[in-house]
Design a protein with these regions (language model features):
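A short, Gly/Thr-enriched small/hydrophobic beta-strand-prone motif that recurs across taxa
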Residues: 35-54, 189-203
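A short beta-turn/strand-edge loop motif at beta-sheet boundaries
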Residues: 57-63, 205-212
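Sec-dependent signal peptide hydrophobic core
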Residues: 13-21
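Bacterial signal peptide processing site
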Residues: 30-34
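C-terminal motif of bacterial Sec signal peptides marking the signal peptidase cleavage site
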Residues: 25-28
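Tryptophan-paired
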Residues: 67-125, 208-297
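Short, low-hydrophobicity acidic/polar segments
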Residues: 77-191
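N-terminal secretory signal peptides that target proteins for export/translocation
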Residues: 1-11
């Protein structure tokens, strides 16, 4: 008799625990039992890293201030987009545990992202040339997603301002979202804007030089970047310095003994083409304004 009672008590306790567990699961998900409980989301948490840099360290939180994520289905058709950015009131992207929460229906998805130093809307409102993204329409193919740099008749008019840094990233594969689950995926960002500082110094008559005597330019057909970081076919653009200055080296009497001329430039990413396609490579040219001579090419 005692054995039967123990057996019945054990199974009664087991059934009670399973019932309690089921109630907890139902009560914590999607507010099935009570309206005041938090909902259970279906979708994805997207994490971001920017470690493709000379420091070889993740600098996403320090550098990126705004991003736009574009969501595509498994066939590469546009579904939706979502933005996140720092502001004067909140700076979520500076948090090391930042993740973008996307509420999605169950299915398989691709994610593509463009990022800037600030919110995309703030970037567009600022002075100078900037990369513009044509927002896709519902059902549009991912192959049409791209960013295009401002230009006027082939000249990138920077208005004495550096380009706002552009990053691009893409999910490595298809991400599957299941019902009542949040999956995690990480997008690695690559910087698409580059910076170069040029310095000119004369060996003969080292003090007889000024940045005002020279013009600088870089030409390259690199103003349109696809969702996969590829360069689209484009016109050849001309980039000019956004800032120039001289550095003087003086003796104790204050006389200039040497001078160095400097020019700071920013431009879109460069690609090194093989010799057979050398005409597509970027070209740096420096001209002497007084003589018209091309001193560097």
């Amino acid at each position: 008799m005692a054995k039967k009672m123990t057996f019945g008590w054990y199974h009664g306790m087991k059934a009670g625990l399973l019932g309690l567990l089921s109630c907890c699961l139902l009560g914590s998900c999607d507010s099935l039992m009570h309206d005041d409980l938090p909902p259970c989301f279906t979708g994805a948490y997207l994490h971001f890293v920017y470690d493709y840099n000379i420091q070889r360290a993740d600098m996403f939180n320090d550098h990126v201030g705004g991003l736009v994520v574009f969501v595509y289905d498994e066939n590469g058709k546009f579904v939706t987009r979502q933005e996140a950015a720092n502001s004067s009131l909140a700076q979520p992207l500076k948090s090391h545990d930042f993740a973008m929460q996307l509420q999605l229906q169950p299915g398989k998805y691709h994610f593509a992202a463009f990022a800037w130093q600030k919110a995309y809307s703030e970037t567009l409102a600022a002075r100078g040339a900037k990369f513009r993204v044509e927002m896709p329409q519902q059902g549009e193919d991912i192959s049409r997603l791209h960013a295009t740099l401002d230009r006027q008749q082939g000249i990138v008019e920077n208005q004495a301002m550096p380009l706002d840094t552009l990053w691009q990233g893409l999910s490595k594969g298809i991400v599957e979202v299941k019902s009542l689950e949040m999956v995690h995926d990480t997008i690695s960002l690559v910087r698409d804007t580059k910076e170069l500082t040029l310095s000119l110094h004369q060996i003969d008559a080292p003090a007889d030089i000024s940045v005002e005597d020279f013009s600088f330019e870089i030409t390259c057909a690199n103003g349109t970047i696809g969702h996969d970081n590829s360069l689209w076919e484009d016109e050849r653009l001309t980039y000019k310095p956004y800032f120039t200055w001289d550095t003087d080296f003086r003796d104790e009497a204050g006389n200039v003994k040497e001078r160095t001329a400097h020019a700071a430039m920013m431009f879109s990413r460069l690609v090194l083409y093989p010799v057979a396609q050398n005409e597509q490579n970027a070209m740096l040219s420096i001209f002497n304004k007084k003589t018209g001579e091309e001193v560097v090419r």
